[in-house]
């Protein structure tokens, strides 16, 4: 099944929502290890309370989950062999980019080369899939 540009854009948005929120979630959840309770059940409840009471965590979490919802909805009409590579590969790229913007050490030239190669591979994958839909009649 070939993909439309709309489906591809939805998958790229999923990757941005997943990958772009990871550094924010990591930063907002720092200090969680300081929560200490006697039982695992109370520990879990206190950790949930600490996370969901923190808007710096809650906003990226909700954006991340909206990416999951969009992914689920997009999978109904998109080939899985296209959706998985786009979302998972580009999510890593978005994580690195947002991490760099936030001042994290993402690695050196090797990380940049990896991002370029990933984007190149995904571009080939997308172009191949979308070009199959060009000129084909719609079967609606």
Curated annotation (Swiss-Prot):
The chain crosses the membrane at residues 1-21, 82-102, 111-131. One of its GO terms (cellular component) is membrane. It is a multi-pass membrane protein. InterPro entries: TMEM234. Keywords: Membrane, Transmembrane, Transmembrane helix. SUPFAM superfamilies: Multidrug resistance efflux transporter EmrE (SSF103481). Pfam families: TMEM234 (PF10639). Belongs to the TMEM234 family. The keyword Cytoplasm does not apply. Its main location: membrane. It is found in: Membrane. This is Transmembrane protein 234. The keyword Nucleotidyltransferase does not apply.
């Amino acid at each position: 099944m070939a993909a439309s540009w709309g489906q591809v854009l939805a998958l790229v948005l999923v990757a941005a929502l997943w990958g772009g929120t990871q550094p924010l979630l990591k930063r907002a959840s720092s200090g969680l290890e300081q929560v200490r309770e006697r039982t695992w059940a109370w520990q879990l409840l206190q950790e949930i309370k600490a996370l969901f009471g923190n808007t710096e965590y809650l906003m990226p979490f909700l954006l991340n989950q909206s990416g999951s919802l969009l992914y689920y909805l997009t999978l109904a009409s998109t080939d899985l062999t296209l959706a998985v590579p786009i979302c998972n590969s580009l999510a890593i790229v978005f994580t690195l980019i947002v991490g760099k913007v936030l001042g994290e050490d993402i690695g050196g030239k090797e990380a940049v080369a990896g991002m370029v190669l990933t984007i190149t591979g995904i571009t080939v994958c997308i172009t191949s899939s979308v070009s199959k839909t060009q000129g084909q009649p719609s079967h609606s």
